[in-house]
């Protein structure tokens, strides 16, 4: 499953996780097994480009599949992605490229509730992406950062600085502009205006639910991970492995598997390309995790956090390039404001983390991934 969407979308005090995620990872994933360095692998430009390319690839592939005529096999899509991810990381582990712990029934029992939250997060995200354009989807994902940040304040003793609060204001403003631009375009375009507005409203509702599910997933993972000390590839392994049986049951019971619906979701002319996109979207989650580790290893967590903020621009632009997202002054303005809000937020976190920590309880946490930060917390206790 595309858990990394969470990942790169949320650089927060406690973890950064996406659209990860998210991805859900936001800063320093576990480092793969070290290999002899070379001038190519040590070049910081290459991992940054690989990370950005992986993020764009995952978003575009998901949108391609979900933008089909009345595509309604979302649980099946997530199941395929999870299976592909498990096969990929098992292969990488066998080849010595990555390492993670073996399956444990006790650890699986502790982690299962988090996998259920992840399913909710990814499913609602897929529904939102189905109804909204990539630029609008990317902009609204920023709102999850606000929910997570204040969840940190309530439950983990975090804090919100003035500059951070300003970035939140820009995020809200960009979302308002994006929604206004979408509705304005729907009203002014030809065709059934009421149907287009209804589609947008459905997308906004799914986006709201997705923001709530994502913040619940991240904050819940922060607590649960203390019981397991998981690293990032451990979380990827258990999240996808535990999700597969649940998704198989959900797709079998809740989705229409009649021959007519299968033909509608997988038209004969596009069947091969749709299946290829589904497989590639599953692989892209592995690419994101690996390139995240590569990026942090050859640069720094600070550089990585800035790359995550800057990465929102090419992801949003990919929707304008590869799909029929409207290119208007309001829509471009929303992307620009959202882009600036991400940069301001990253700068605010860097400045906050640079301040000396005083007192027993930390008021800010490093820009690291959920698994890494929570493991440190458990070691302190």
From Swiss-Prot:
NCBIfam families given in the database record:
nst
Under InterPro entries, the record lists: SCL35B1-4/HUT1 (IPR013657), TPT_transporter (IPR050186)
Q: Enumerate the Pfam families for this protein.
A: UAA
Q: What is its biological role?
A: Involved in the import of GDP-mannose from the cytoplasm into the Golgi lumen.
One cellular component term from this protein's GO annotations in UniProt: cytoplasmic vesicle membrane
Question: Has the keyword Transmembrane been applied to this entry?
Answer: yes
| GO MF term set | GDP-mannose transmembrane transporter activity
Q: Where in the cell is it found?
A: Golgi apparatus membrane; Cytoplasmic vesicle membrane; Endoplasmic reticulum membrane
Q: Mind telling me which residue stretches traverse the membrane in this protein?
A: 40-60, 69-89, 110-126, 134-150, 160-181, 200-220, 233-253, 274-294, 303-323, 327-347
Query: Which superkingdom, per the lineage?
Result: Eukaryota
The UniProt similarity line reads:
Belongs to the TPT transporter family. SLC35D subfamily.
Could you tell me the membrane topology recorded for this protein? Answer: Multi-pass membrane protein
Please list the residue ranges that the record places on the Cytoplasmic side of the membrane: 1-39, 90-109, 151-159, 221-232, 295-302, 348-381
- Quaternary state and partners of this protein? Homooligomer.
Q: Residues on the Lumenal side?
A: 61-68, 127-133, 182-199, 254-273, 324-326
**Native organism:** Aspergillus oryzae (strain ATCC 42149 / RIB 40) (Yellow koji mold)
Keywords (alphabetical) are: Cytoplasmic vesicle, Endoplasmic reticulum, Golgi apparatus, Membrane, Sugar transport, Transmembrane, Transmembrane helix, Transport
Protein name in the entry: GDP-mannose transporter
């Amino acid at each position: 499953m595309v858990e990394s969407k969470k990942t790169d979308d949320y650089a927060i005090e406690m973890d950064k996780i996406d659209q990860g995620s998210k991805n859900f990872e936001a800063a320093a994933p576990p480092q793969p097994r070290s290999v002899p360095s070379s001038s190519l692998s040590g070049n910081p430009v290459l991992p940054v480009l690989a990370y950005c390319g992986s993020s764009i690839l995952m978003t575009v592939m998901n949108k391609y599949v979900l933008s089909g005529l009345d595509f309604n096999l979302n649980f099946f899509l997530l199941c395929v992605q999870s299976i592909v991810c498990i096969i990929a990381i098992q292969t990488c582990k066998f080849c010595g490229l990555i390492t993670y712990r073996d399956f444990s029934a006790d650890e699986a029992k502790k982690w299962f509730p988090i996998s259920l939250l992840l399913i909710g997060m990814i499913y609602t995200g897929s529904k939102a992406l189905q109804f909204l354009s990539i630029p609008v989807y990317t902009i609204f994902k920023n709102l999850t950062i606000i929910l997570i940040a204040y969840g940190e304040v309530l439950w983990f003793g975090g804090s919100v600085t003035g500059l951070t609060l300003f970035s939140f204001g820009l995020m809200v403003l960009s979302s308002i502009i994006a929604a206004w631009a979408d509705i304005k375009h729907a009203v002014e375009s030809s065709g059934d205006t009421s149907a287009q507005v209804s589609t947008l409203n459905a997308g906004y509702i799914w986006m709201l639910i997705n923001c709530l599910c994502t913040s619940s997933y991240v904050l819940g993972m922060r607590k649960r991970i203390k019981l397991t000390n998981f690293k990032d590839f451990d979380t990827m392994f258990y999240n996808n492995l535990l999700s597969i049986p649940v998704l198989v049951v959900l797709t079998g019971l809740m989705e229409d598997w009649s021959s007519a619906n299968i033909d509608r979701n997988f038209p004969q002319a596009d069947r091969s390309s749709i299946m290829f996109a589904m497989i590639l979207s599953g692989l892209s989650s592995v690419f994101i995790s690996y390139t995240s580790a590569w990026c942090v290893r050859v640069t720094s967590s600070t550089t990585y956090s800035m790359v995550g903020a800057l990465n929102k621009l090419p992801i949003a632009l990919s929707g304008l390039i590869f799909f029929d997202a409207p290119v208007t002054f309001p829509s471009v303005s929303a992307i620009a404001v959202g882009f600036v809000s991400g940069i301001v937020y990253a700068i605010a976190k860097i400045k906050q983390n640079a301040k000396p920590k005083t007192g027993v309880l930390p008021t800010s946490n490093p820009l690291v991934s959920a698994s890494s930060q929570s493991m440190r917390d458990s070691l302190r206790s």
